[in-house]
A protein has these predicted regions:
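Bacterial N-terminal signal peptides
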Residues: 5-15
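Sec/Tat signal peptide C-region and signal peptidase I cleavage site
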Residues: 17-21
Length: 611
């Protein structure tokens, strides 16, 4: 969108304020820079937290039982050769993108593997990729295998008998119509690619399953969907399930076959049973969606389950995997990790993994007790069919922003996506006296919020979360108190239906001129002078509040309104460090405002021609 540069503009304005106060004559015409020699002695070190972030891609080796891979959505590709006891990142400094969308190891030669970049679980913080990468030495070195314009991928599937033949599911650009999407095939190990399945410029490929008994039989799904800052849409005429019996040269659509649900169709996950090639499972997003099963290779279908447990938040999940040894066993990945042993009719087994929100599963084709699963905490391994799992301890956490506490030595604090807030020591652990004896501590709030440390009491933190949640946490006592601006829960509502529009990660900042004053922002700027006991609104609506950006999110099948879609908000807030009563505010829909009288009046100072 043309106004997305507004945050950078506000930060630039706030940074320039001290210069104006020190030198009233002129402002510099060139941006500031720092001599690299001043930074040459600085070295980075990992201070934690020692807990993983989201993963949506896993794979393993059939012939090497202790070798597995998982891809982080922001931390690259990781490998273990000791069954998950230890992990090593394989891509740092070797590839130019750390957002792993899919990964596969060649069954015929486990030294050969491919991974795709860019994610397709269309969250508000979805990240683009930079093509496909290939390794011939178990991940020690990498070469680009092209398709950089596709941007976002999900699956990569390799012919189990031919490491040079592979397919990738290219979803494409998630925010704009593009022709760079569909199923791509390479017959020469990624040197060249052909687009073999394509519907239109709004529908990308999202899943692929190859029949291990007959690798020329392939199933693939296309998904019409988009994500923009103010919402997302899943479903449309471009979505569909397809089958090829000649290695991807020709395709027939299965979505219209008897037993399939009527449109509109959304996201589809598919898996063919390695036990019986005629048995295929499809998880279909539709009004009458659910689990659909065929025993004739897709000619006819029957719905075996319409449970919401297997199809909630379809855009974020809709993954499944057939068991390689048991025909009637199928796993579904959703909020819970579910298993059916009756051909997809019921899912009574909830497999306990270290973290919730499940996205991918690889099962060893020669041992159905050995598997690796991907969830919002990373990759985790089981060698007993899911009875127990390895820990998810590696530095792949996605942190929204950092806050330095006023302790000495100080703590480094942040909110971790898909987890909680977390503070870790900057120096060592000797001075840490954490309640409960943990390695770090949460300061309340949630996964997406700002954290503000009280400038007068280093033990007091204010931490936010989506939906306008705001907590006050006292480190010395361990007590948490809700100090929300409004006692409201907007989950499930459109932005147009809620009184205050708090962004997924809304600003919470102290006034550097008045240490008793704390600010927060929705479409309005709010302040408290009594530690959140009461709040006062000090601005009008400082956004464009365009109705086109405030409507329902999710599309015509499954609404999804969890707070990340809340738009037209004050996204950046910067009280001046030098001038009392001066506050700058930037909205996510492209406006800059300033007050010089503590909020009594505001001026729109949006630069003309802002890109």
């Amino acid at each position: 969108m043309q106004y997305l540069a507004i945050v950078a503009a506000v930060v630039g304005i706030a940074a320039a304020a001290p210069v104006r106060a020190q030198d009233e004559q002129t402002l510099p015409t060139e941006p500031y820079s720092v001599d690299d020699s001043y930074l040459s002695g600085l070295k980075w070190r990992n201070v934690g937290p020692d807990r993983g972030g989201r993963s949506i891609a896993v794979s393993g080796s059939a012939s090497r039982p202790n070798e597995y891979y998982f891809g982080a959505t922001g931390g690259g590709l990781w490998k273990t050769i000791d069954g998950g006891t230890s992990w090593k990142v394989m891509t740092d400094g070797k590839v130019d993108n750390g957002v792993v969308g899919g990964v596969a190891v060649c069954e015929a030669n486990p030294d050969i593997l491919y991974f795709t970049t860019g994610e397709t679980e269309l969250r508000g913080n979805v990240q683009p990729g930079h093509g496909v990468f290939k390794s011939l030495d178990s991940g020690k070195t990498w070469t680009s295998a092209g398709l950089k314009k596709v941007r976002n991928f999900s699956r990569v599937r390799i012919d189990p008998k031919d490491c040079n033949t592979l397919f990738v599911a290219g979803f494409g650009h998630y925010g704009a119509p593009r022709e760079d999407r569909g199923v791509y095939k390479s017959s020469d190990g990624g040197a060249n690619w052909r687009k073999v399945l394509y519907r239109d410029e709004r529908s990308g490929a999202v899943d692929i399953s190859i029949d291990p008994k007959d690798p020329k039989t392939i199933y693939a799904s296309l998904w019409e969907a988009w994500r923009r800052p103010w919402g997302m849409s899943s479903g449309g005429p471009g979505s569909g399930l397809f089958k090829s019996v000649d290695g991807g040269e020709h395709w027939s659509e299965l979505t219209r076959n008897p037993g399939m649900p009527a449109g509109p169709i959304g996201k589809i996950g598919v898996t063919v049973s390695p036990v019986d090639s005629a048995r295929v499972y499809a998880l279909v997003e539709a009004k009458d969606g659910g689990m659909f099963v065929t025993d004739d290779g897709g000619a006819t279908w029957r719905r075996t389950s319409d449970s919401r447990d297997i199809r909630q938040r379809a855009f974020y999940y809709t993954r499944l995997q057939a068991d390689p040894k048991v025909k009637d066993r199928v796993y579904v990945l959703n909020v819970n990790f579910l298993r059916s042993d009756d051909g997809g009719k019921t899912f009574p087994t909830k497999i306990k993994v270290p973290h919730g929100d499940n996205h991918d599963l690889w099962i060893a084709p020669n041992d159905n007790q050995r598997m690796i699963e991907a969830n919002d905490g990373g990759g985790t391994i089981s060698v007993n069919g899911g009875k127990s799992w390895t820990k998810e301890s590696y530095p792949t956490a996605q942190i929204y922003r950092l806050t330095i506490s006023n302790h000495y030595p100080y703590f480094v604090c942040g909110a971790q996506q898909d987890n909680s807030s977390i503070c870790v020591p900057s120096k060592d652990w000797k001075h840490v006296n954490v309640l409960g004896g943990q390695y770090g501590f949460a300061v309340a709030g949630g996964e997406s919020g700002y954290i503000a440390n009280d400038p007068q009491d280093p033990n007091v933190f204010y931490a936010g979360s989506y939906g306008g949640a705001l907590d006050r946490f006292d480190y010395s006592t361990g007590q948490t108190r809700s100090v929300n601006v409004l006692p409201d829960n907007p989950m499930g509502y459109s932005a147009s239906d809620i009184g205050e529009r708090f962004q997924w990660t809304y600003p919470i900042v102290f006034d550097p001129q008045d240490k008793n004053r704390l600010y927060a922002s929705s479409q309005h700027v709010w302040q408290t002078l009594d530690q959140g006991q009461s709040w006062q609104r000090i601005s009008p609506d400082l956004t464009r509040h365009d109705p086109a950006t405030l409507g329902p999110s999710g599309g015509g099948i499954t609404l999804d309104q969890t707070g990340v879609e809340t738009y037209s908000t004050v996204f950046a807030l910067a009280p001046s460090r030098l001038e009392p009563n001066v506050i700058w505010a930037g909205s996510d829909d492209g406006l800059v405002h300033v007050t010089r009288d503590d909020g009594r009046s505001w001026q729109n100072v949006t630069p003309a021609g802002l890109p």
